[in-house]
Design a protein with these regions (language model features):
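Extended polysaccharide-engagement surfaces of secreted carbohydrate-active enzymes
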Residues: 1-168
Length: 168
């Protein structure tokens, strides 16, 4: 998909795109060059990366559907965008965990304690979306703060995360 960016590019742009791909996509054993904090407003996602660890927070709002169900993959991902936070040091911390995960207790999410099956979301109706627009982040590029108001399934929570060089 990244190679499709080169269509219509001049020689200099094509070289830059190839270098970007080589640096960031072709060698999974090499480090990504990004360090700092970035909030992606169109996706309700925050990424915080230091030389020694990284974290990401996945959220949803009334304008962003928090999770997808495609080809019956992610059948239990209903709560994935209710503030799920992933922290990494090595990069393989979540390898093969999904068959054993309690999908109501994913780090960072807010959900009812229940033995009932995780709700199905075979369509993208209103029940899948967070009912509030209050999801956002501020950053100076190195540190940042992310916040959300969760209002879904009758459950409400005000949630925030502060990202620094040393901690979340």
């Amino acid at each position: 998909a990244a190679c499709s960016l080169m269509k219509g590019s001049n020689d200099q742009q094509a070289r830059e795109i190839k270098e970007l791909i080589a640096r960031n996509f072709l060698h999974p054993d090499t480090n990504n060059e990004f360090t700092g904090n970035k909030f992606f407003g169109d996706s309700d996602l925050t990424i915080h990366r230091t030389p020694h660890w990284m974290a990401s927070v996945r959220m949803a709002s009334d304008r962003v559907i928090g999770t997808e169900l495609v080809n019956e993959d992610n059948l239990k991902g209903y709560y994935m965008a209710d503030g799920a936070i992933y922290t990494y040091i090595r990069g393989d911390e979540y390898h093969n965990i999904f068959p054993f995960w309690d999908w109501r207790k994913i780090p960072g999410i807010t959900a009812y304690e229940s033995e009932a099956p995780v709700p199905a979301f075979f369509n993208y109706g209103a029940h899948v979306r967070n009912k509030t627009a209050f999801v956002g982040g501020v950053t100076d590029g190195e540190t940042g703060m992310t916040a959300m108001v969760l209002d879904r399934d009758g459950l409400q929570a005000h949630k925030s995360w502060i990202f620094t060089r040393d901690y979340v």
